[in-house]
Design a protein with these regions (language model features):
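Oligomerization/assembly interface segments of phage tail-like spikes and tubes
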Residues: 60-85, 148-161
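Short, solvent-exposed loop/edge segments of extracellular or virion-exposed proteins
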Residues: 206-227
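Extracellular modular ligand-binding repeats in secreted and cell-surface proteins
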Residues: 220-247, 274-276
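Short helix-loop boundary/capping segments
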Residues: 103-142
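Mixed-charge, glycine-accented linear interaction segment located at domain edges/termini
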Residues: 131, 135-202
Length: 286
């Protein structure tokens, strides 16, 4: 019998954008600017029309021709700050006066990033790699005794990059990373635009915990106990608890370089950032 878990999409947050600076297969390749916040996001939908049409030969449907439209991403957001509005719509903003100048614009391509979530609380981190924003409408109304207020609706038309990525040999429209599988490091996912070539699997390192004759020190990660069977990853933080009833020394080594830290109190916690295979040794001090 097949066991199936039913989930629905419920949650979206963290909408950011970054200008696409270059997109080619030459020296520059695919490059972008630094991501910036757009506005709070209430709802996001993506649509893509796919058309399949059969062509007839020898009195039978012999060939199917398939075509795809650009992606249309519709985003309901809070009021967009005027400087951000100018940036994403290709208009002018004067920082010295706080003035948006509406007029002839210079449209630019942007990548957008955001986080979606399902009803199981599992997040998907997304970067859409190339597209252009419309100029969103703005509705303003008088303040009355009600609670009505207006956000804005952005429409982002997404296309495929001209740049062909090494991983696939093709361009890409977007990447979607399931964080629940814990296969990649997503700590800095939105610090820069991610592509098929920048996403790589986590490299698991080993940890060896050695106890002294009467020590009972322990190691935790994210509030969970770490054992010799626990995989550890680069840049993760381990908390080392070298505790026993007497004074204890703690030694940890990485790549054969031993470092000793003396714990005179017997119960001080040390933090350690993983850099490679790690050995943590607890031993008694007379």
């Amino acid at each position: 019998m097949i066991t199936q878990t039913i989930k629905e999409w419920r949650g979206v947050k963290g909408l950011v954008a970054a200008e696409v600076l270059t997109d080619d297969n030459g020296t520059d390749g695919y490059t972008t600017g630094t991501p910036f916040d757009i506005a709070g996001v209430a709802e996001l939908s993506r649509t893509r029309d796919v058309t399949n049409e059969a062509h007839y030969y020898n009195d039978i449907p012999a060939v199917v021709i398939s075509g795809e439209s650009p992606d249309t991403v519709t985003v309901s957001v809070s009021a967009i700050p005027l400087d951000v509005f100018a940036k994403i719509t290709g208009q002018t903003y004067d920082n010295a006066t706080g003035m948006l100048i509406e007029g002839q614009r210079t449209p630019k391509y942007f990548a957008i990033g955001y986080i979606t979530e399902n009803t199981a609380g599992e997040e998907v981190y997304v970067w859409r790699l190339k597209g252009m924003f419309n100029i969103p409408d703005q509705d303003n109304s008088t303040i009355d005794d009600g609670t009505d207020a207006n956000g804005q609706e952005l429409i982002y038309t997404g296309v495929e990059t001209a740049h062909k990525f090494t991983k696939t040999g093709k361009g890409a429209r977007a990447i979607n990373v399931e964080t629940a599988k814990d296969l990649v490091d997503t700590a800095n996912f939105f610090a820069t635009v991610q592509t098929p070539d920048t996403i790589t699997p986590k490299v698991a390192y080993t940890i060896t915990i050695v106890q002294g004759e009467s020590t009972n020190g322990f190691v935790t990660k994210g509030g969970e106990f770490v054992t010799n069977a626990t995989p550890i990853y680069k840049d993760e933080t381990l908390l080392i608890h070298p505790y026993n009833s007497a004074r204890t020394s703690m030694v940890y080594s990485v790549g054969g370089a031993a470092i000793e830290t003396r714990n005179q109190a017997g119960n001080t916690t040390f933090s350690y950032t993983v850099r490679g295979d790690t050995t943590i040794t607890f031993y008694d001090v007379q």
